[in-house]
């Protein structure tokens, strides 16, 4: 039976409490780490295109200020509620700690269906929401820095930064009040694909660990692995893209209208264009339509990537999931009951709280760019290329051998912004994966990777509180 009265925040608290038993921190400090520090629930009027006034419900939660600013996305959805926003803000604290990004956790949401509003109405709602955050000091480059989430994107972030700058004239670092902006407005190249690429880097690192893969009965590496992706949004699309490009076989993709299966693999860009033309992923050439979109979750595969919304795998359907590895690209796609099932089955769950940290990691890079007021690579790209050219020319003169044009182009290339962003993200995800695995392997009592990830996060936040002291 599907769990009734599901609370996402309670689910996060359960995972926290489970991990806290494996740490040395006193009870009072653990309660502070777990608590949401500030919850701003708001309602404000907006005049719609037809002249009527609609009262909009919104939230911004700051889970922790052990490091500032707070960081977390803003989602537009009719499913937005205080419980969800609190849970997501909590996960942001733990996520940032795990990947060594110096932010506290935050999250925001507006309870609307963005598809039911015109562009002008969405702009007014976004700008009014931003002004409410400014009034209560809930936004700013050193206070709380939002980002895109479900139902929002670059457009909304541009509206936010413009509103903030209008209300805070002369603030030199104002571009850092929000991330996920268009590149022309201070955004960073590589942000769009960051979460999906981070998912790939994290799972690839796990797949490269021989001892882990041996326990699962799988060969090392991602090449040839059967992958199922739930969701063809930004995260699902890019997860599928990077797995396919690195030799995996994406056999199924699901969306809200249905799911498809193709034994020899699905090209995500071709499917995206098919959906754009027809309005659906169904009837994709060469693929089989599945009866229900949830059927994709239960297909035989090596890696399952839920990249949609939370609570899609629960105590009811978890026993039928056949994947050996589940990579939580979405926030909270598994309930605690599902976790218990997978622990008993020996399925490896790579947890959301670090696996989808690519977005906040690259948001951190964007924030740093905004504070430094210079594009990554601008100062060193040409210097590096000239130096590499000189070294290569010297080697050719000394050896009497010439490299091919393709090799020369590769060797002489100086890193530009997207190269540096991708490299920084790869380093971040590899380091985080290894830290979590080291904690898990060091204590055989820790039951799963999620608990090990929470232990990692709790220890880092606890250390911060201890070193800074409790004021006053």
Predicted segment positions?
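Adenosine-phosphate binding glycine-rich loop
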Residues: 2-7, 206-207, 320, 324-472
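Glycine-rich phosphate/diphosphate-binding loop of Rossmann-like nucleotide-binding domains
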Residues: 186-300
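Rossmann-like adenosine-cofactor binding region
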Residues: 258-349, 354
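Glycine/serine-rich phosphate-binding loop and adjoining beta1-alpha1 elements at the start
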Residues: 77, 97-223, 468
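Short, Gly/Pro- and small/polar-rich lid/capping loops
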Residues: 2-43
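Glycine-rich, N-terminal phosphate-binding loop and its surrounding beta-alpha-beta segment
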Residues: 42-114
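Conserved active-site and cofactor/substrate-binding residues in soluble primary-metabolism enzymes
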Residues: 7, 11-14, 80-83, 117-128, ...
